[in-house]
Amino acid sequence: MAQHDQLHRYLFEQFAVRGELVTVSETWKQILENHNYPQPVKRVLGELLVATSLLTATLKFAGDITVQLQGDGPMNMAVINGNNQQQMRGVARVQGEVPEGADLKTLVGNGFLVITITPDEGERYQGVVGLEGDTLAECLEDYFLRSEQLPTRLFIRTGEVEGQLAAGGMLLQVLPAQNAQGNDFEHLATLTETIKTEELFTLPANEVLWRLYHEEEVTLYDPQDVEFKCTCSRERCAGALRTLPDEEIDSIMAEDGEIDMNCDYCGSHYVFNAMDIAEIRNNASPADPQVH
């Protein structure tokens, strides 16, 4: 098995085209933990994970990207959030029976692809495109064409290696403010499209690039680790409780004696008792530990 859960950037200087290659296994597995998703939903989350990793690698600033599918199908929501440090988390919501072998359109139904870019400093940007493509890669290419106006191709694969979940993908994109020739970009895209799933999952990045582009000059940069990391915390939950009306909190406390909050992403469980609520109302941060 190749070195998994790593992202590699590479560059074709003579063509003004950049590329990325990512493979993930453990990160995908951790996203699926604590959830009993049908197989097609697991696959889509793997594809979203790959896509989000590739997209966050295009950021030139500290921040995060959220890639979300929304629709009226049996999987009415699936989302992956990742930052420029390649820290990922994700979740899906299933509201109906998922047919075995369901494709993207069957899962999501009539829906949208929503991409939200949130810099640590600066304005948040959100782009929305209809799910007109048959695959997630096609929908993302449509997004780039409409919003960024940068020729972009994505190649996303999911499967198993030695009994372990594996997902991977590649991205090609014309560098901003560069005038790459269309024929050159299509030539590189045609080469990239020949990647075999087994090669992507099992070969080191430098060997994958050599097999695809051995007649081209390619600069491969140092890899970046991809990992699962949830940003939930007791403090964030307390902040959410501060936004609720006192009457609503009092009603829950009167009925249950405490407030339970669960993180959909990682399964962490937070409990707030009457003393905690009093501290929250006094703008103090409750110090009780989280309960897993």
From Swiss-Prot:
Disulfide bond positions: 230-232, 263-266
GO MF: protein folding chaperone; unfolded protein binding
CDD domains according to UniProt: Hsp33
Keywords for the protein's UniProt record, in alphabetical order: Chaperone, Cytoplasm, Disulfide bond, Redox-active center, Zinc
UniProt-listed GO biological process terms: protein refolding
Recorded superkingdom: Bacteria
CC per GO annotation: cytoplasm
Subcellular location: Cytoplasm
Pfam families, A to Z: HSP33
Record note on modification: Under oxidizing conditions two disulfide bonds are formed involving the reactive cysteines. Under reducing conditions zinc is bound to the reactive cysteines and the protein is inactive.
Free-text function comment from the UniProt entry: Redox regulated molecular chaperone. Protects both thermally unfolding and oxidatively damaged proteins from irreversible aggregation. Plays an important role in the bacterial defense system toward oxidative stress.
Similarity comment: Belongs to the HSP33 family.
Family annotation (HAMAP family): HslO
PANTHER family: 33 KDA CHAPERONIN
Protein name, entry field: 33 kDa chaperonin
Protein's gene: hslO
